[in-house]
Design a protein with these regions (language model features):
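N-terminal leader/targeting segments and the immediate start of mature chains
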Residues: 18-91, 158-161, 235-242
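Gly/Pro-enriched, hydrophobic low-complexity segments
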Residues: 167-242
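Extended lipid/amphipathic-ligand handling interfaces
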Residues: 45-52, 81-88, 109-117, 195-202, ...
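Short, surface-exposed coil-to-beta transition loops
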Residues: 74-81, 103-108, 190-195, 222-226
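An acidic-aromatic
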Residues: 81-144
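Hydrophobic lipid-interacting interfaces of membrane-associated proteins
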Residues: 65-71, 99-103, 115, 122-125, ...
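Flexible, processing/modification-adjacent segments and terminal tails
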Residues: 120-189
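Sec-dependent bacterial lipoprotein signal peptides
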Residues: 1-21
Length: 242
């Protein structure tokens, strides 16, 4: 009798603990991520707001990266990753990692202020050289104006949603290559489009990220992906000549 009584007491004490553990495990097992939801605003309204914001932008910082490819910015110089700053309307600073046609890694950059073009010598640390204006690979680079044109000329919007975790609107569509090629110092493929994804801040309607999936220049592979991340909108920024 004493043994049975002891066993009964143990079982009686164990059951609540086991129940709590089971509930805890069950709750953790069924935790699901916050779903991407339908926005409470139309994609046209979002793009209109974003276009207005971009037109009023004075300064911005950006990062460029590539998957499955690169951008040839000058003969034999291929940009893979870059970070830069832009002051509207005519000052750009960009530092990039890249390769030469022989596979040699280089780190270089450009500073363009009005009509003056300086290139960071890839073989001499911190040495900038003045170039003739016609050697400026980013002569038409204006990320603010280019993104404004992208917003205006977005086509075939296939998907549109809101991610509450990142507080961003996600827009998926197509864009003619001639509207995005100038960001990379390229001439767009004639009468061709590429897939584009936009991530737009839901509070201020800034463009946070642009992904271009597919070729925009005549030397691009079919599976190339370019990504541009924008940040630090309208913060004080001064680009000076070296």
């Amino acid at each position: 009798m004493n043994i049975k009584k002891t066993q009964f007491i143990k079982c009686f004490l164990f059951l609540p603990i086991a129940t709590l553990l089971a509930c805890s495990i069950g709750e953790n097992s069924f935790i699901t991520p916050t779903p991407i939801v339908e926005p409470q605003i139309s994609v046209e309204e979002i793009l209109n707001h974003s276009h207005t914001v971009m037109l009023d932008t004075k300064t911005v910082k950006f990062q460029i990266s590539h998957s499955n490819g690169f951008t040839e910015i000058m003969d034999g110089i291929f940009l893979t990753n870059a970070q830069g700053e832009f002051v509207n309307p005519d000052a750009v600073s960009i530092i990039f990692d890249g390769e030469m046609s022989n596979g040699f890694y280089i780190k270089s950059g450009f500073k363009i202020v009005q009509d003056e073009v300086f290139m960071l010598n890839p073989f001499r640390e911190n040495e900038w050289e003045l170039l003739p204006p016609n050697m400026n690979p980013f002569d038409e680079m204006d990320p603010i104006d280019s993104i404004g044109e992208v917003i205006e000329n977005l086509q075939n919007i296939r998907s549109f949603n809101y991610d509450p975790n990142t507080q961003q609107y996600n827009v998926f569509g197509d864009i003619k290559t001639n509207f995005v090629a100038p960001i990379f110092g390229l001439n767009g493929l004639l009468d061709q489009s590429t897939n584009i994804e936009l991530k737009i801040d839901s509070n201020h309607f800034y463009i946070n990220q642009v992904r271009l999936i597919g070729p925009i220049g005549n030397r691009d592979p079919e599976d190339i992906v370019r990504e541009i991340i924008f940040s630090n909108y309208n913060e004080p920024l001064l680009i000076e000549v070296p």
